[in-house]
């Protein structure tokens, strides 16, 4: 049986938060005592707060400590997906607004997948807003440098040749606010390239 630990919405503060510190101490203690056990960890989103531009140091330290507490190999057993707070503030033209304007022109029901398929040039500016997240993910996991994988884009990473893990960024249209719209690049997720990576007899 495979067990995994899913953690989400870390929202680490740059300064010490007593409640957060207590929660982290309790979690790490349970991991070290084996009350919490996992074969791999999936950490999904909000590794910092939107207004703490580029400040991922607390999450970087925590994830290292967590993986050590669980006795896991961070390079093989940690999987990351960004959240809506993991975008950089807009500098210049807003790529989200450009995308929504085009989506509205394409069809009345704002069919995002259709717009991404027809206007692939709109995707890179959306992904570029995750540049600080990309830097953190690359510092944690060498696979994002060696294989050319984009930690903010759709991609597959196998876990120890036993399980395929498909990474989907649902925060493409996020702006750091609570009322953001969710969107994912379904065209890439269903592409022949991704389907090929999902082959090999692994679930």
Predicted regions and their residues:
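N-terminal active-site segment of His-dependent metallophosphoesterases
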Residues: 1-78, 88-90, 195-199
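Residue-level signal for short, function-critical loop segments
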Residues: 10, 47, 84, 169-174
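Charged/polar, solvent-exposed surface patches and flexible loops
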Residues: 25-29, 61, 65, 128, ...
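His/acidic metal-ligating clusters that form di-metal
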Residues: 33-40, 148-203
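Generic detector of ordered secondary-structure context
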Residues: 51, 93-95, 160
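Active-site neighborhood of divalent metal-dependent phosphoester bond hydrolases
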Residues: 65, 69-149
